């Protein structure tokens, strides 16, 4: 029997706040009978949204009142100093104290990472936490990190990202010995900067990691690796570029099918295929970036997410909490450190 999982939700964060988080929470409770959710935010506002949604499962849904909200453009340092009663911080504090098994927020990414790192701390042996998300590929999906938390990384940092990504892919997505690839400007050993080359050496030496070598940008979408490792600058640019290209292709297809009567008829005939394609590349399906390397489960939802997308982030947080991903990462790092000391 599955034990109860409690998640704290930053109900005020993101572009839409409670209007997205509350319905997403109610839908998540229907999907997960063992789940208890805590909506963290301004109680009066949250109760209004619950009443509007005809909420009827109060036994597994509760509210934690707080008075402040972190703005989407607020500097992380200001959020840490001046927003100690914010919905984001209180939700993470619940993870720190053990009141919640994980937390989900659609709020300011920089403030979330800074607050999570300050409250939850990094795991022993992990220098920096990283942001990991899932990206659709020809073979299904791949997991990519870092996506913006660390602009400058050493080879050791990239190696740690590979370890964390492999553990999460195994535990949450059921992949056995996931292939870990380093994003690079070429597949040849001589290509890349010193940090990437050093990371490659460390990954090759580790028996804990199934290292797949260097992969180029197009290799991400061909499914050449289950986990793709890069620094946060490269990862964020690659992710945002991919989202832009997907939007461009969708718009081009829409324009072409509306060009004339013949193309409109073709569009009607192709509608089932187009709908299937849209589902496969719909970014909402892959919403929910994991903050790996912390002593607790924390998920970042896209700020503009709708209730369906936010619900996907909740689903990922449930799986990470069920599997105890932070503990699994800690155990893997301990084995690696022990192997280094014994070498």
UniProtKB/Swiss-Prot annotation:
Superkingdom, taxonomy of origin: Bacteria
Cellular component GO terms, alphabetical: cytoplasm
Entry annotated with the keyword Cell cycle: no
Family matches, as Pfam families: FA_synthesis
Keyword Transferase appears in the UniProt entry: yes
GO molecular function, one term: phosphate:acyl-[acyl carrier protein] acyltransferase activity
Keywords assigned: Cytoplasm, Lipid biosynthesis, Lipid metabolism, Phospholipid biosynthesis, Phospholipid metabolism, Transferase
GO biological process, one term: phospholipid biosynthetic process
Pathway: Lipid metabolism; phospholipid metabolism
Intracellular or extracellular location(s): Cytoplasm
Catalytic activity: a fatty acyl-[ACP] + phosphate = an acyl phosphate + holo-[ACP]
E.C. numbers: 2.3.1.274
SUBUNIT field: Homodimer. Probably interacts with PlsY.
Membership in a protein family: Belongs to the PlsX family.
Function of the molecule: Catalyzes the reversible formation of acyl-phosphate (acyl-PO(4)) from acyl-[acyl-carrier-protein] (acyl-ACP). This enzyme utilizes acyl-ACP as fatty acyl donor, but not acyl-CoA.
Name the record gives this protein: Phosphate acyltransferase
Organism annotation: Halorhodospira halophila (strain DSM 244 / SL1) (Ectothiorhodospira halophila (strain DSM 244 / SL1))
Gene label: plsX
């Amino acid at each position: 029997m599955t034990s109860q999982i409690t998640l704290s939700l930053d109900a005020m964060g993101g572009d839409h706040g409670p209007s997205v988080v509350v319905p997403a929470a109610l839908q998540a409770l229907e999907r997960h009978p063992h789940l208890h959710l805590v909506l963290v935010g301004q109680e009066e506002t949250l109760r209004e949204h619950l009443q509007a949604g005809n909420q009827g499962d109060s036994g597994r849904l509760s509210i934690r009142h707080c008075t402040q909200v972190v703005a989407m453009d607020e500097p992380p340092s200001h959020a840490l100093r001046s927003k100690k009663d914010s919905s984001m911080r209180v939700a993470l504090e619940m993870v720190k104290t053990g009141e919640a098994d994980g937390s989900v927020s659609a709020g300011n990414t920089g403030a979330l990472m800074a607050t999570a790192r300050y409250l939850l701390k990094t795991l022993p042996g992990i220098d920096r936490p990283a942001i990991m998300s899932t990206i659709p590929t020809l073979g299904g999906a791949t997991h990519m990190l870092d996506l913006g938390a660390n602009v400058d990384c050493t080879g050791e940092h990239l190696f740690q990202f590979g370890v964390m990504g492999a553990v999460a892919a195994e535990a949450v997505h059921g992949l056995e010995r996931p292939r870990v690839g380093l994003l690079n400007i070429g597949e040849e050993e001589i290509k890349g900067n010193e940090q990437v080359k050093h990371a490659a050496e460390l990954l090759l030496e580790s028996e804990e990691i199934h290292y797949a070598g260097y992969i180029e940008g197009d290799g991400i979408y061909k499914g050449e690796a289950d986990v793709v490792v890069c620094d946060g600058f490269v990862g964020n640019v690659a992710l945002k570029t991919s989202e832009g290209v997907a939007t461009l292709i969708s718009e081009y297809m829409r324009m072409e099918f509306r060009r004339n009567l013949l193309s409109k008829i073709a569009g009607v005939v192709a509608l089932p295929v187009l709908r299937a394609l849209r589902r496969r590349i719909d970014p909402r399906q892959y919403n929910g970036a994991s903050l790996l390397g912390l002593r607790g489960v924390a998920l970042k939802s896209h700020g503009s997410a709708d209730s369906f997308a936010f619900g996907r982030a909740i689903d990922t947080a449930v799986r990470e909490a069920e599997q105890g991903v932070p503990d699994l990462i800690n155990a893997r790092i301990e084995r690696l450190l022990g192997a280094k000391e014994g070498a």
